[in-house]
C-alpha cells in the first residue's frame, strides 16, 4: 500500500518569512494538495539565542496571508530534544555512533591541517575506535555518527538528479553536543521520520545536508524520504538575491501593496514552468504542479514582472474586495492611521465608486491608495510642485469660471459634468485638455489622477464646488 504523501515546511524563526521560504512553503503545499496529502509545519527553533516569538508569529502570519494552510498542529523542534537524544543513544548502543573527547584546540588543529592539505574531511576520526577509558575525566564528550569510511552516499533527487558523494570525504558528524543538545542534522532526520514525512522539498543549499542525513537514516534503518532540492532565487543580474533585488520578508511585500494571489502566482513560476502559461488560479496551480517541471538553474527575481502581474490581479479584482484589501493595508503603512481615521461609510462608498478608474492605473495597492488620496484630502488641498506650476493667475481665474459653469449641473454625474465642460471649452475656444488640467489640480492637488469627470462624480457637487472655490482667483 502506498503511503499518503506528507510534505513539511520547516523554517528557522530567526527573522521574517523570507521570500524564498515563501516559495518553498508554496511548493510543499501545492505538491501535497495535488496528491491529496498533507503539508506539515515545523518550527526549527533549536537556536535559542536567535529564535524569537515575534519571528515565529511573522512566519505564521506570512503563511496565512499567502493563503498557505498547513495541516495539524505546528511542531516545535526544541520541544522534541529528549526524543532526539534518545535516537543518539540508540545509535551509540548499536555501535553506530561513538563518544568523541577531542578538545576545541585539537579540533581546530585538525581543521587547519585538513585545509592546508586540501582535504574536505575536517575531523580525523581519532576517537572513532579509541578506548573511552583514555578520555579526560572532566571532559563532556560529543556523540558522533560512525559514518562509512568508503563507498558512496547517493541521493536520487527529483530535481537535481543522481547526486553522489564519496564517503571518504564526509566527516563523522556530531549528533549530540557536549552539553547534550542535539544538532540540527540529527533533529531534522528524527523529526521527519517521526512526522511520517514522505517528501522533503527544500532549497538546494541543503543538498550537502542530504548526504549527511541519509547516513543517519541508513544507520537507523529508516526509509529515506523522496528528496527534491529546488534552485535558489537570484537577482535579475544572476547574483545572490539581496534586499535591493527583493530579498525581503513576505510581510514587506504585503506592506508594498502586493496581493497574496499575485505573489503566489509569481512565486510558483520562479523555477517551475507549465508550458507558456503565466497566470494560474490556485486550483490550476494545484492541478499542474509537478516536481519534474522544476528546473535546476537558479530562478531570477524580476520586480517589473511581479508588478505587472500584480496589476493584472488588481484589474481583475472586484471593487469591493479591493476596498477591503486597502483597509487591511492601512495597518502596514506609515500613513495608514491618518487615512483610517477618515474612513466612513461615505468615503468607503466613494472608494468603491472610484475603483474602476483607480484600478486601471495601479500596479500595487500602495499606488491605488496614493491615487485615491483625493478622496481623503482636507481642504484647502495641499498642491504638489507640478500642480503649483499649473496654477498661474490666469488659470486661477479660469477655475473660477469653471466653477460657475458647474454650479447648475443636475444631476451631478460624470456624464453631465463632462457635457458641461465640453460646452464651456467650445464656447471659450479652448481644447478640453486646457479645461481638464486646471480642474484636476484644483480637485486632487496633482497633475495626474483618475479620469477627471470620474473624480467630479466621486467627490460630489458640494465638495467639488468648495475645492474649486479654494483655488479660484
From Swiss-Prot:
Organism field: Rhodopseudomonas palustris (strain HaA2)
NCBIfam families per UniProt: gltX_bact (TIGR00464)
CDD domains: GluRS_core
The protein's name in its UniProt record: Glutamate--tRNA ligase
Pfam families assigned: Anticodon_2, tRNA-synt_1c
Residues spanned by motif 'HIGH' region: 11-21
Binding annotation for ATP: 243
Gene Ontology molecular function: any one: glutamate-tRNA ligase activity
Catalytic activity: tRNA(Glu) + L-glutamate + ATP = L-glutamyl-tRNA(Glu) + AMP + diphosphate
Keywords: Aminoacyl-tRNA synthetase, ATP-binding, Cytoplasm, Ligase, Nucleotide-binding, Protein biosynthesis
Gene Ontology annotations of biological process type: glutamyl-tRNA aminoacylation
Subunit structure: Monomer.
Membrane keyword on record: no
Role: Catalyzes the attachment of glutamate to tRNA(Glu) in a two-step reaction: glutamate is first activated by ATP to form Glu-AMP and then transferred to the acceptor end of tRNA(Glu).
InterPro entries in UniProt: aa-tRNA-synth_I_cd-bd, aa-tRNA-synth_I_codon-bd_sub2, aa-tRNA-synth_I_CS, aa_tRNA-synth_I_cd-bd_sf, Glu-tRNA-ligase_bac/mito, Glu/Gln-tRNA-synth, Glu/Gln-tRNA-synth_Ib_cat-dom, GluQ/Sye
GO cellular component: cytosol
Enzyme Commission designation: 6.1.1.17
Homology family: Belongs to the class-I aminoacyl-tRNA synthetase family. Glutamate--tRNA ligase type 1 subfamily.
Xref: SUPFAM superfamilies: An anticodon-binding domain of class I aminoacyl-tRNA synthetases (SSF48163), Nucleotidylyl transferase (SSF52374)
Signal peptide from the UniProt entry: none
Chief location: cytoplasm
Motif 'KMSKS' region, residue numbers: 240-244
Protein's cellular compartments: Cytoplasm
